[in-house]
């Protein structure tokens, strides 16, 4: 079986899915103590890198996704599927798991 090479630019989410690059979590506390990976909070902030075409409605039309590529978003803590590509962390979310846009 041939190996599949996946590049971030080739990821095309389906339906109402949104592909988000995770913002790095804090490496140390306010007091300067370095945190091990096991003590870090799971990130909830990221930048949208790809969006799907939207959820299909009963009449066959699609509901547009409210976020666009480049938007910063806040998402549910345990939502989505974590993906690592090229040493970077990403998460594939349903649009409903996005809580807010961040200016």
Curated annotation (Swiss-Prot):
**Main localization category:** cytoplasm
By its UniProt entry, which InterPro entries does this protein fall under?
Chaperonin_GroES, Chaperonin_GroES_sf, Chaprnonin_Cpn10_CS, GroES-like_sf
Does the keyword section mention NADP?
Answer: no
**Which GO biological process categories is it annotated with?**
chaperone cofactor-dependent protein refolding
Recorded superkingdom? Bacteria
Q: Name one GO molecular function term.
A: protein folding chaperone
Key word Transferase present: no
Q: Name one GO cellular component term.
A: cytoplasm
Entry keywords, A to Z = Chaperone, Cytoplasm
Q: Which SMART domains does the UniProt entry name for this protein?
A: Cpn10
Please give the function described in this protein's UniProt entry. Together with the chaperonin GroEL, plays an essential role in assisting protein folding. The GroEL-GroES system forms a nano-cage that allows encapsulation of the non-native substrate proteins and provides a physical environment optimized to promote and accelerate protein folding. GroES binds to the apical surface of the GroEL ring, thereby capping the opening of the GroEL channel.
Return the similarity comment. Answer: Belongs to the GroES chaperonin family.
Its subunit composition reads: Heptamer of 7 subunits arranged in a ring. Interacts with the chaperonin GroEL.
| Name of the featured protein | Co-chaperonin GroES
The species this protein belongs to is Gloeothece citriformis (strain PCC 7424)
